[in-house]
């Protein structure tokens, strides 16, 4: 016995035991009526399976037609158009497993409607353990095991199962509801409809429980989709008068009628129905169905009877017909029964010809309506099956949180969330799970098994849900739609995350700093800031990252991959964010505006960085020298001065740089690319800064001003060199003679004195 059953809590145990005892202790009409009241009906798949398994060979149709019908029934059951091979295999295994179970256990397990063989096994295991523990108090569930039984404990565990195989199954007559004709006449239309419903539900419940049931002929009549629209009252019939002349006077006809019709059981009506059906030739008094009917006229005119037998047969046949027609008709029909009159040795009947005018259900018409959800159906059995889904919904309630479940096994699995119980343990790594299905999925990590394959691209998956999600990449299906903005998503989780944009909900809270997040993944990424954990390592340069996405982006530096391409100019980028930034150069859009100076930016990150120029905030500090920076990228670039790291290397000449932008600019030396062009004179430049400086020659702009002498300059470097005149700073020193200079160009010229190099004009 699995640990799950051993550690089952008392709430689950009591619910299973109560269900088992109530089903086992009650038999006959009460048990089935209880099932009716709770509407524990068979699912559509089970009905299709029964139709397939119990399909009779039609002699008149021939073998080819029979094979075609059988194939159609099989397709309705297995549904290969929506089920995978694994799902069809699961249906077959579940069917065979339920077949080999002992009778009463099979009945009980079926009544729980397991959706998989794994769920059915769990039900049997849980029930087995409970009954073993209850065995000392309940002698009806098990027998005393002999002391010298060679089978030992196993015999005790399985003995109660074997005993159940010999139990006798009930028949349809055992559950038939008996009523008298007098009771029927006193019933209201709603009660008559209920009686019809109960009769059909009794039959379908016995089929759903796997019992061998001979189909009474009244069942297909009750299931026929037709309605009575009117009845025709006729006068005396000459044919009836002729037949009535053969009957001699009767002193007390009412006595005969009462005796014959005192108690008419449902199964008796089946016998009369069989007789009438065998003697039917059509014509006078007929119930119309799709395939057959029976005639009272033909039945009464077959042979001559004495008066008493003639009249009593008439009443009995009439009463049974009234019973059938009242069971069938869906609307309350008032039947005007005119009394038989005997006059001077002749029987003249002013009879009612129940000439019920029927019409077939029109195409598309659905006369049967569900009282719960309002859904309509063409056939009554379809309504019964549908109503079972409402009754089966949420039958088991969790005592901890009040949540309801359809199946007891689902409740047991749910309660492990409250208890923290994880009875299913992986033998490979020791990880434990609350459900066996989760363990099965986990074990595929160790085995490498990926049983679910995409038919389009051949990619394999370990879980069916992952395959379903993947297939949407091929179909483009996005079934999850936001009701606020209409945006659609391929995953339900993506829709949930998106909806938090509208609601502003941030349910994930960091325990360290209290910061909230709308997605759990964002919280996990944030928590790595506090822990300092960087589990993702680059195999090329051994750099570590806190997030896998950062590592993927970094690896594109080594591979040179640029998978994001601009549709306007064809330029490619390694990161999607860089492409988005680039696209703003084509649109000119600058939607982020500074509230202080009014300057506009194309990206929110640029606006955030700009704000720091007003506030003076420098949140990024170097741990080595203490220097602070307003941007994290500037800190990263600065730290490379201390560690000497130059991760950006030119593939042509091997020169390395601390910044990727410097490498990009350097590579233009090899390619000769000059992407920055002056609109005034057409001159092109390698660097954007060079273009900016050049354009000032056309505009005359001199934005850099000396605070000492108010002299203006077009370039910042020129201002820096000029300011050294005021400060006397000479940062460039000769290594040979120690002479210092204010500009690097002056130092280069001086060094030629020592080297003997001549300046080129």
From Swiss-Prot:
Residues 134-154 are annotated as: Disordered. Residues 170-238 form the KRAB domain. It is found in: Nucleus. One of its GO terms (cellular component) is nucleus. A zinc finger (C2H2-type) spans 368-390, 396-418, 424-446, 452-474, 480-502, 508-530, 536-558, 564-586, 592-614, 620-642, 648-670, 676-698, 704-726, 732-754. GO terms for biological process: regulation of DNA-templated transcription. It comes from the Eukaryota. It holds the Pfam family zf-C2H2. Keywords: DNA-binding, Metal-binding, Nucleus, Repeat, Transcription, Transcription regulation, Zinc, Zinc-finger. Residues 49-131 form the SCAN box domain. GO terms for molecular function: DNA binding; zinc ion binding. May be involved in transcriptional regulation. Belongs to the krueppel C2H2-type zinc-finger protein family. This is Zinc finger protein 287. It comes from Pongo pygmaeus (Bornean orangutan). The gene is ZNF287.
């Amino acid at each position: 016995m699995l640990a799950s059953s051993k550690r089952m809590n008392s709430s689950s145990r009591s619910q299973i035991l109560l269900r088992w005892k109530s089903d086992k202790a009650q038999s006959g009409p009460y048990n089935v009526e209880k099932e009716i009241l709770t509407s524990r009906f068979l699912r559509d798949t089970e009905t299709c399976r029964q139709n397939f398994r119990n399909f009779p060979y039609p002699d008149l149709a021939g073998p080819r037609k029979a094979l075609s019908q059988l194939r159609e029934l099989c397709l309705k059951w297995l549904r290969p158009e929506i089920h995978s091979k694994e799902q069809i295999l699961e249906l077959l295994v579940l069917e065979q497993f339920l077949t080999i179970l002992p009778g009463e256990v099979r009945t009980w397990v079926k009544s729980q409607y397991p959706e998989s063989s794994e769920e059915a096994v769990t039900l049997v295991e849980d029930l087995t353990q409970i009954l073993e523990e209850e065995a000392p108090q309940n002698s009806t569930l098990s027998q005393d095991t002999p002391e010298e039984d060679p089978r030992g404990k196993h015999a005790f565990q399985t003995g109660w199962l074997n005993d159940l195989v010999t139990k006798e199954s009930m028949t349809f007559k055992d559950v038939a509801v008996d009523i008298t004709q007098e009771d029927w006449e006193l019933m209201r239309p709603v009660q008559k409809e209920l009686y019809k419903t109960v009769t059909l539900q009794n039959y379908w419940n016995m089929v759903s429980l796997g019992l061998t049931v001979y189909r009474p002929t009244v069942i297909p009549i009750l299931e026929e989709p037709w309605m009575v629209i009117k009845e025709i009252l006729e006068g005396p019939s000459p044919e009836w008068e002729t037949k009535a002349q053969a009957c001699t006077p009767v002193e007390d006809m009412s006595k005969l009628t009462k005796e014959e019709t005192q108690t008419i059981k449902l199964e008796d009506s089946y016998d009369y129905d069989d007789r009438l059906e065998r003697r039917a030739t059509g014509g006078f008094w007929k119930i119309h169905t799709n395939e057959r009917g029976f005639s009272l006229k033909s039945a009464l005119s077959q042979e001559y009877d004495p008066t008493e037998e003639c009249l009593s047969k008439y009443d009995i046949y009439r009463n049974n017909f009234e019973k059938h027609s009242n069971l069938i008709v869906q609307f309350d029909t008032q039947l005007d029964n005119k009394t038989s009159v005997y006059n001077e040795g002749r029987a003249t009947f002013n009879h009612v010809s129940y000439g019920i005018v029927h019409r077939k259900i029109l195409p598309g018409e659905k006369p049967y309506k569900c009282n719960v959800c309002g859904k309509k159906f063409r056939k009554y059995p379809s309504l019964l099956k549908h109503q079972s889904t409402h009754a089966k919904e949420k039958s088991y309630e969790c005592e901890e949180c009040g949540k309801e479940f359809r199946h007891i096994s689902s409740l047991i699995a749910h309660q492990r969330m409250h208890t923290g119980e994880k009875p299913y343990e992986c033998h490979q790594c020791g990880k434990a799970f609350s459900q066996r299905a989760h363990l099965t999925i986990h074990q595929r990590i160790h085995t490498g098994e990926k049983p679910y394959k995409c038919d389009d691209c051949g990619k394999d998956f370990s879980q069916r849900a992952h395959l379903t999600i993947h297939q949407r990449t091929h179909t483009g299906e996005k079934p999850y739609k936001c009701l606020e903005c209409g945006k659609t998503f391929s995953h339900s989780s993506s829709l949930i995350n998106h909806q938090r944009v509208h609601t502003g909900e941030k349910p994930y809270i960091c325990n360290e700093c209290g910061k909230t997040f709308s997605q759990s993944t964002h919280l996990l990424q944030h928590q790595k800031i506090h822990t300092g954990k960087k589990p993702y390592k680059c195999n090329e340069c051994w750099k570590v990252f806190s997030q896998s996405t950062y590592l993927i982006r970094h690896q594109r530096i080594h591979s040179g991959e640029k998978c994001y391409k601009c549709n306007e100019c064809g330029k490619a980028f390694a990161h999607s964010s860089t492409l988005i930034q680039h696209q703003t150069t084509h649109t000119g859009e600058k939607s982020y505006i500074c509230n202080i100076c009014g300057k506009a930016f194309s990206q929110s990150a640029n606006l955030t960085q700009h704000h720091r120029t007003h506030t003076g905030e420098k949140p990024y500090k170097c741990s080595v020298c203490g220097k602070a920076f307003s941007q994290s990228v500037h800190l990263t670039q600065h730290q490379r001065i201390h560690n000497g790291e130059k991760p950006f290397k030119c593939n042509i000449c091997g020169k390395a740089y601390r910044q990727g932008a410097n490498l990009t600019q350097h590579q233009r030396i090899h390619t000769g690319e000059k992407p920055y062009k002056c609109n005034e004179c057409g001159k092109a430049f390698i660097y954007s800064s060079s273009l900016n400086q050049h354009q000032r020659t056309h505009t005359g702009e001199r934005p850099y001003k000396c605070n000492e002498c108010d002299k203006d300059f077009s370039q910042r470097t020129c201002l820096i060199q000029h300011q050294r005149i005021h400060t006397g700073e000479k940062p460039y020193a000769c290594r040979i003679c120690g002479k210092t200079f204010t500009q690097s160009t002056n130092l280069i010229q001086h060094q030629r004195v020592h080297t003997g190099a001549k300046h080129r004009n």
